């Protein structure tokens, strides 16, 4: 995910996986939906207390990144979710996406119909480096 805490560490791990012919899976490429939120989104109370606290803590610190995602999405006439997932695919990762609605499945299935350009990828990388990252997953080993 563009909000992963240590992208460089993940790149090293991906190289090890490639060298050993192991597929690399990108967990939570939408960062709990944060990367799908319009940059002008004003947080409202969500049904889930956990989800609401995550959104409130990451709304402002990710505005620049979400603006970049939205610009690419609008230019290509795709969703912000497609852009965030395509960033993972660009690196050769298999995204593991939590989708709850049929409309989301149909939207994300279109990711396979296009690829980010090098310029778009670099724009997302640059915006990602300057924003608040999600905490590491407590269920993974280091």
Regions found by a protein language model. Name each.
Residues 1-142:
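Beta/alpha (TIM)-barrel catalytic core signal, keyed to glycine-rich beta->alpha loops juxtaposed to Asp/Glu
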């Amino acid at each position: 995910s563009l909000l992963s805490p240590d992208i460089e560490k993940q790149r090293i791990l991906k190289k090890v996986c490639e060298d050993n012919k192991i597929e690399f899976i990108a967990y939570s490429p939408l960062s709990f939906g944060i990367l799908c939120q319009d940059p002008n989104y004003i947080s409202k109370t969500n049904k889930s207390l956990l989800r609401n606290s995550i959104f409130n803590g990451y709304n402002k610190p990710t505005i620049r990144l979400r603006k970049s995602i939205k610009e690419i999405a609008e230019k290509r006439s795709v969703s912000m979710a497609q852009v965030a997932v395509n960033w993972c695919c660009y690196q050769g990762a298999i995204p593991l996406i939590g989708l709850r609605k049929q409309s989301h499945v149909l939207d994300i299935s279109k990711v396979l119909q296009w690829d980010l350009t090098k310029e778009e990828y670099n724009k997302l990388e640059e915006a990602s480096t300057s924003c608040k990252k999600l905490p590491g997953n407590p269920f993974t080993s280091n």
